[in-house]
Structures are given as C-alpha cells and as structure tokens.
Amino acid sequence: RDVQDIASIHKEKELGRLMELLALRTGNLLNVSNVSSDLGLDRETTEKYIAILERLFLVRRLPAWHRNRAKRLIRTPKIHVVDSGLAAMLNQLKTGDWISHSGDFGPVLESFVVQQLICQAGWLADDLNFSHYRDKEKVEVDLVIEQGRDVWGVEVKRAASFNTSDGAGLRKLAAQAGGRFKGGIL
C-alpha cells in the first residue's frame, strides 16, 4: 500500500521478488545489471524499484569509499537490507541455523551492525558519512566512517576469535587513508 503512495508500480509482484533477491545479497556489492537479468526486468525498472525500496527504508545502498572523492561516485555500492530480521526471514534463516548455516548469517550480521551504527550516529551533533572499502584484490572493510577528514574502519566477523589476516582490510584502509585514519574495530 505504501508503494502505491510513493510511486506508480506496474509490477508489484516483481517488487516483492526484488526485495527477496536483495535480501539474499545483503552485505554484498550491488550489481544492478545482474539483478535485472535475474529478475527479467530492464535495468531502468530495477533502478526505479531499488530507489522505491530505499525511500521505504527497506534497503540502503552503502557507497564505496576511495581517498579520491570523485572516484567514490563511480565505484560499486553495497546493498543492505535495513531490517536484519526481515533479511533473515527472506533468507529462510532460523535461530537454530546460526551454526549449521553460518555462511548465510555473516552478511545478515554485517547488515545489522551497519544499520545499528548508522542509526546511533543520528544522536551525534557532528555529521558522519558511511561507506565501504574494497580494493582490486577484493580486500574489504565492511563500514568506513568519516567525520570531516577523519576515517575509521569497522570489520564485522561472525566468530568468537580472530586472527591477524582478519585485519587485512583495516590495514589496507589505513594505508589508503594515511594520516586521516584514526582507528579500526574488528
């Protein structure tokens, strides 16, 4: 019903399928061409429907971080389902699946953490900018937080312990940000 108030949708069923597909890809890079192809929709319609889901606060595009601000505009964003419970339900994940389907929970956990940090930032007086980092070697940081020129990284892991290789993305981000890098959380 809210969808009809926001935009004229000609294929309501496809909008639901899109939401389900985005839930399956939460926490991953958003390739609109692949999504369009998988749903049998043209790219323009897919872009329009994703924008509608964003306006309904169901999904969030997390832009890519690059030290060159112009390059941020052309890098691939990640897609996150805003409600991690909805993402888990659409992924057909149950509480007991935490261990047996652990690979499926990682992206949902990442989306949860990203959304919680963005929501909590609303309480701050200073504006924060949020993005993700991924280089050509596919080394990534799940969340990059900027306050002015200062940069922090957050890497989400679904594990009780970690090893030094888990911090590779944070080290790469620190190298890219240089003196602007203020710290990271793993």
PLM region spans:
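Accessory nucleic acid-recognition modules appended to NTPase machines
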Residues: 1-151
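Short, histidine-centered active-site or binding-site loop motifs used for metal coordination
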Residues: 94, 157-158
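Conserved beta3 VAIK motif of the Hanks protein kinase fold
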Residues: 154
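Catalytic cores of nucleic-acid endonucleases
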Residues: 158-186
